[in-house]
């Protein structure tokens, strides 16, 4: 089996690590209309990403990493680590529109196999304001399947866990889709299981039954 977990709002209580970082770096007021413009069709996702990252140009990467490492995991995360230990033959992947540093934490702290996220360009220890790669807002499922194929990962079942509308494409590609602590914008389309609790322990209890 392959378990694919969204990160922001699923593994962490922070719905958006982008906004979390904007708040810390005091750039939230400059970016507050970007999402509105995107959802109104005035910006492409590539333009939205570029405009946000430009606000962090020349930020020391170690400062940026410390902010990301300050993001907590959800309550009950230790149960997921135990579940992952018991499922040692299965593949656990973190897939996020958030940053690779949070994906690295999922590998090191939660013992996931790998991650897919925003890979930031770094030059001389500072952010350049550009990204090397990132999942499209409406393309996480496509990105996940391509990752599995390119890494020759075979599986009998693909189980996906997410919380928001940008996880819908991922849900469409999965054998079992689970909405965990879902946002109010997420409808039941393409979702097999809804878990309104935000405690990871309750999610893990469901995973044991699948």
Question: Which stretches of residues belong to each language-model region?
Answer:
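Metal-dependent phosphoesterase signature
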Residues: 47-79
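Short, surface-exposed acidic
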Residues: 29-35, 61-64, 155
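Short, mixed-charge, low-aromatic patches
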Residues: 4-11, 33-40, 57-60, 97-105, ...
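C-terminal cap/substrate-recognition subdomain and adjoining C-terminal extension
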Residues: 2, 69-210
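Short acidic/polar alpha-helix capping motifs at helix-coil junctions
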Residues: 14-15, 43-48, 63-70, 131-134, ...
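Residues that form generic nucleotide/phosphate-binding pockets
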Residues: 24, 34-37, 51, 55, ...
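A broad structural signal for alpha-helix termini and local helix breaks/kinks
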Residues: 25, 56-59, 110-111, 151
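Active-site neighborhood of HAD-like aspartate-dependent phosphohydrolases
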Residues: 1-46, 50
């Amino acid at each position: 089996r392959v378990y694919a977990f969204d990160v922001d709002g699923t593994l962490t209580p922070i719905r958006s690590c982008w906004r979390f970082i904007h708040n810390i770096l005091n750039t939230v007021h400059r970016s507050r209309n970007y999402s509105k413009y995107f959802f109104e069709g005035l910006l492409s996702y590539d333009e939205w990403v570029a405009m946000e990252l430009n606000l962090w140009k020349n930020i020391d990467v170690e400062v940026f990493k410390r902010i990301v490492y300050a993001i907590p995991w959800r309550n009950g995360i230790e149960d997921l680590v135990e579940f992952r230990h018991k499922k040692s033959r299965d593949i656990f992947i973190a897939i996020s529109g958030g940053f690779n540093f949070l994906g690295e934490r999922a590998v090191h702290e939660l013992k996931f196999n790998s991650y897919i996220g925003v890979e930031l360009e770094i030059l001389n220890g500072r952010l350049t304001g550009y990204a090397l790669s990132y999942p499209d807002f409406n393309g996480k499922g496509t990105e996940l399947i391509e990752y599995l194929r390119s890494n020759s990962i075979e599986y009998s079942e693909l189980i996906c866990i997410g919380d928001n509308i940008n996880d819908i494409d991922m849900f469409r590609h999965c054998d079992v889709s689970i909405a965990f602590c879902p946002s109010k914008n997420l409808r039941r389309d393409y979702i097999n299981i809804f878990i309104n609790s935000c405690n990871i322990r309750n999610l893990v209890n469901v995973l044991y039954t699948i």
